[in-house]
Swiss-Prot record:
GO terms for cellular component: ribonuclease P complex. InterPro entries: Ribosomal_Su5_D2-typ_SF, Ribsml_uS5_D2-typ_fold_subgr, RNase_P. Keywords: Endonuclease, Hydrolase, Nuclease, RNA-binding, tRNA processing. Belongs to the RnpA family. Its EC number is 3.1.26.5. The gene is rnpA. GO terms for molecular function: 3'-tRNA processing endoribonuclease activity; ribonuclease P activity; tRNA binding. It catalyses: Endonucleolytic cleavage of RNA, removing 5'-extranucleotides from tRNA precursor. This is Ribonuclease P protein component. The lineage of its organism: Bacteria, Pseudomonadati, Spirochaetota, Spirochaetia, Spirochaetales. Consists of a catalytic RNA component (M1 or rnpB) and a protein subunit.
Length: 119
């Protein structure tokens, strides 16, 4: 799969996910996840930050870590097409690659169950 297929970019689709998508909150990590099934064959991801999150270096590093963890866990989403938005709020973040990867695995499985129940 091409790298550009992983990113969610359309403003209309992003607004639709925020309005109609399901929400999972992680208050201990200052993280929210919105997800919704899509009409495509593959899943897409967007990592965004709250307004108070300063420092472009830190933001971009976290964004890269999320995208890489998602890319590696993509095989768990075989047959399920999701649009996923992560909203990272400012706080005492100690997000390492391994914590994000384990979080991603749990979230993907949780989304899979949520989509399965709604069918």
């Amino acid at each position: 799969m091409r790298k550009r297929n992983i990113s969610l970019k359309s403003k209309i689709e992003i607004q639709k996910i925020f309005k109609e998508g399901k929400l999972i909150r992680f208050s201990n990590l200052n993280l929210k996840m919105f997800y919704k099934s899509n009409h495509l064959v593959y899943s897409r991801i967007l990592v965004t930050f709250s307004k108070g999150f300063r420092g472009s270096v830190k933001r971009n590093r976290i964004r890269r870590l999320f995208k890489e963890a998602f890319r590696k866990r993509l095989e768990l989403l075989e047959g399920i097409a999701l649009d996923i938005i992560f909203v990272v709020s400012y706080g005492k973040l100690t997000l390492t690659y391994f914590s994000i990867e384990s979080l991603m695995k749990g979230l993907v499985l949780r989304c899979e169950r949520g989509i399965g129940e709604s069918k």
